[in-house]
Amino acid sequence: MSRCRVGAAGMLEGADCAVVVIGDEQKSDVWIEDCTIVMSNMHTMAASLGLGSCWIQGRSREAAEGGTTEDFLRTILKFPENFRLEAILSLGMPAVKPAAYELETLPTDKVHREFFGG
């Protein structure tokens, strides 16, 4: 599975677990949003359990050997054509725990107040 994505899925090779999140585009026109909510919730829950996790974007991405990440995973997992790939959540025990950021060291040029550019 680590070859499912160009340059971004190497950690899957040694991951303890990977959750592939797919949505049925025939049942929902907001399957992308639904899958994104699922990914966000699992990401947050993993952190609360002390697990390391990494969101690997799958939709509209290329596999290492060519073709799409979605088709690569469809071949392995055999999910039907109407199910579409959103992402993969890699899970495992973190090798290191980085220190928390200090608020005053964070860049603020992306923070806007009241209106864009404000």
Stretches with model-predicted labels:
Residues 1-118:
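Acidic, surface-exposed loops and disordered segments
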